[in-house]
Regions:
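Conserved "right-hand" nucleotidyltransferase catalytic core of DNA-directed polymerases
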Residues: 1-99, 116-118, 125-128, 187, ...
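Short acidic (Asp/Glu) and glycine-rich catalytic loops that position anionic groups and cofactors
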Residues: 3-17, 107-115, 130-140, 155-160, ...
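Conserved catalytic core of nucleic-acid polymerases
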Residues: 8, 24-28, 62, 162-284, ...
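Short, contiguous acidic/charged loop-to-helix segments that flank catalytic cores in large enzymes
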Residues: 22, 50-55, 87-90, 94-98, ...
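Short, hydrophobic/amphipathic alpha-helical patches that form generic packing surfaces
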Residues: 32-49, 129-134, 176-184, 251, ...
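Function-dense linear segments that define catalytic or interfacial modules
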Residues: 66-168
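Short amphipathic alpha-helices in soluble, non-transmembrane regions
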Residues: 302-310
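Catalytic phosphate/metal-binding cores of nucleic-acid and nucleotide-processing enzymes, i.e., regions
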Residues: 319
Length: 337
């Protein structure tokens, strides 16, 4: 049997859980069973890995590489916390979703704090779309992010939905679309998200590029120029080399996210330490941090400090779009993200 590396070189794809999750309903039953099995295998592998990494103090001490990815994002090892799936919400409609519904929530609950302590989970709210607004220098996009409301359909995902120009597209479909689009998804993938044929998917992308202020110029002019030059300059002034045009926009968004989050962590930690708060930073994953504290009072004060600190980061880095955070307090990771 070929390993994944050989298989990718030969066929251009691998038989992975991620790829099999894109199977259409019309795929053979055997393919769906294989997808279910791979999902179960992945959950079992994670549990075995976690048990093996648990130390005498009952904790897992993972490793962080602060610029482990080419974009400047952190990478993680032993275990890779970035690959731990979020809990599945809603009614499972496939065998794979049933596996996720059964296991992913309980697996998140395993990541908890000491008895009596609280976990504060805070993330940089909508950070990649805010970085996109910064790159486009679009006041209209900023307004939708900052002042738009889901209730009256003026929020950013409803704005994106209307920009696609397809009547049956829902807000949730538009939300899935925008992140796939920004990561460089091809027309077949976008067609599957929007539940249209490829011609309609291409038309939707064209509509989107024309409708969103500043996006066409970013995608058609700025990104190709950056790719030809071979690098972009991040929010903190560092030059970041880009491997190719296809990965450039996603790289710029991830780099912006990474720079903002790292500056923010330094800012709120300094402020919390100055106040003498008792806290323990226990995890950073992309746009979120998890912090252990001994009381609800400290948890609430820490959240206020984190919000205030993000405002200073926006000013320090001169980000075009206002930045924001959202927080939850709980006893485990399931409750805080």
């Amino acid at each position: 049997m070929k390993d994944k590396g050989e298989h990718y070189k030969t066929y251009g794809w691998t038989c992975s859980e991620t790829n099999l999750n894109t199977l259409p309903d019309t795929a053979p039953e055997g393919a769906h069973k294989l997808s279910e099995w791979l999902t179960l295998q992945g959950r079992r592998t994670s549990l075995v890995e976690w048990l093996g990494q648990c130390k005498d103090d009952g904790r897992i001490h993972g490793r962080f590489m602060h610029i482990g990815a080419w974009t400047g994002r952190m990478s993680h090892q032993a275990p890779n916390q970035a690959n731990i799936p979020s809990a599945f919400h809603g009614d499972p409609k496939t065998a794979v979703e049933s596996v996720k519904h059964r296991y992913d929530g309980p697996m998140r609950k395993l990541w908890c704090v000491d008895d009596g302590n609280y976990l504060v989970g805070t993330d940089a709210e909508g950070i990649q779309l805010r970085i996109l607004a910064h790159l486009m220098q679009s006041k209209a996009y900023v307004d939708a992010i900052v002042t738009g409301k889901k209730e009256d359909e003026t929020d950013i995902h409803n704005v994106n939905k209307r920009a696609l120009g397809i009547p049956h597209v829902t807000r949730d479909m538009a939300k899935t679309f925008i992140y796939a689009f920004l990561l460089g998804a091809g027309i077949p993938k976008i067609a599957s998200i929007l539940k249209v044929n490829r011609t309609q998917a291409q038309g939707a992308v064209n509509n989107f590029l024309e409708s969103i202020d500043g996006l066409k110029e970013l995608k058609k002019k700025k990104i190709p120029h950056i790719a030809r030059r071979g690098y972009f300059t991040g929010l903190d002034g560092r030059k970041v080399k880009v491997p190719n045009e296809h990965k450039t926009l996603a790289g710029m968004l991830q780099n912006g996210e990474s720079v903002v989050v790292k500056h923010w962590v330094l800012e709120w930690k300094k402020a919390a330490e100055k106040e003498g708060l008792d806290f323990k930073l226990i995890d950073i994953v992309h746009d979120e941090v998890q912090v252990e504290v001994p009381s609800m009072e400290i948890a609430e004060r820490l959240i206020r400090i984190q919000k205030e600190s993000m405002n200073r980061v926006r000013d320090n880095l001169d980000v075009f779009c206002p930045l924001a955070v959202s927080s939850d307090i709980g006893r485990n990771w399931y409750e805080t993200h």
